[in-house]
């Protein structure tokens, strides 16, 4: 939630019924494009799978905003060859389900600074006194658990109960009591990825790991792996 839960305030005096309302529906950033088109009297193209917010503006019930979908690929050049950490997630009122497509990669970047463009360990986390402290005392009682959450590997699936664990500290995925919830959210997420033709699901070319990197490079010889010829 720290990366994706952002308040949204909208003002449109002539287009919002009963202004001043607080809406708890989930909004994806991509929903803004069809909203602007609809507001301008235009029909969103069929390629747009996001949903307009106009029904919410008009104080009508909407079935299209009951969950938020989140995605991540490469954030920083902190793995060998410029590889990212691909994951997709679905956030509902009660749960957060995350699917990590490459669980053998370091989510916060490699601990080996020589494979990081900026020559720092765990490059997804910027240098700071807090990071330095956690790295230096990561084996100390009271710090080890936090350090593992910050720097450690993650399983292929994560599931958090936001009512009992709002800070998402305890991964429930794989436990019997939440098996049905996990399966339901997994299906909803993967159905959405199929609808949006996400290549991580459809089997098409996945080029995100091979995109050029435009950040600072301090490590001599560091570069992004070239795109495989089969994907040209």
Predicted features by range, described:
Residues 17-18, 77, 105-106, 168-169:
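Flexible loop/turn segments at secondary-structure boundaries
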Residues 136-157, 162-232:
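Long, internal low-complexity/basic segments
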Residues 12-14, 72, 100-101, 163:
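Active-site-proximal beta-strand/loop segments in catalytic clefts of secreted hydrolases
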Residues 40-158:
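C-terminal cap/loop subdomain of S1 sulfatases and analogous C-terminal strand-loop tails that border
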Residues 1-47, 51-66, 88, 152, ...:
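Substrate-binding rim/cap in mid-to-C-terminal beta-strand-loop elements of soluble/periplasmic
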Residues 23-27, 111-118, 174-177:
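Short intrinsically disordered coil segments
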């Amino acid at each position: 939630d720290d990366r994706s839960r952002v308040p949204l305030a909208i003002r449109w005096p002539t287009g919002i019924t009963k202004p001043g309302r607080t809406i708890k529906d989930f909004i994806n950033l991509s929903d803004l494009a069809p909203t602007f088109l609809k507001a301008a009297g235009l029909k969103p193209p069929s390629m747009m799978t996001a949903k307009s917010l106009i029904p919410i503006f008009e104080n009508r019930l909407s079935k299209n905003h009951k969950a938020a979908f989140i995605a991540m690929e490469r954030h920083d050049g902190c793995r060998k060859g410029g590889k990212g950490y691909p994951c997709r997630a679905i956030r509902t009122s009660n749960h957060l389900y995350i699917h990590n497509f490459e669980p053998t990669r370091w989510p916060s970047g490699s601990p080996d600074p020589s494979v990081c463009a900026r020559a720092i360990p765990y490059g997804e986390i910027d240098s700071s006194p807090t990071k330095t402290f956690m790295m230096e005392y990561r084996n100390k009682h009271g710090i080890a658990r936090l350090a593992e959450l910050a720097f450690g590997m993650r399983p292929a699936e994560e599931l958090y109960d936001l009512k009992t664990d709002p800070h998402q500290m305890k991964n429930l995925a794989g436990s019997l009591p939440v098996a049905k919830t996990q399966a339901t959210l997994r299906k909803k997420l993967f159905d959405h990825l199929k609808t949006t033709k996400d290549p991580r699901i459809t089997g098409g070319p996945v080029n995100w790991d091979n995109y050029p990197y435009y950040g600072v490079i301090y490590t001599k010889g560091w570069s992004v792996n070239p795109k495989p010829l089969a994907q040209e």
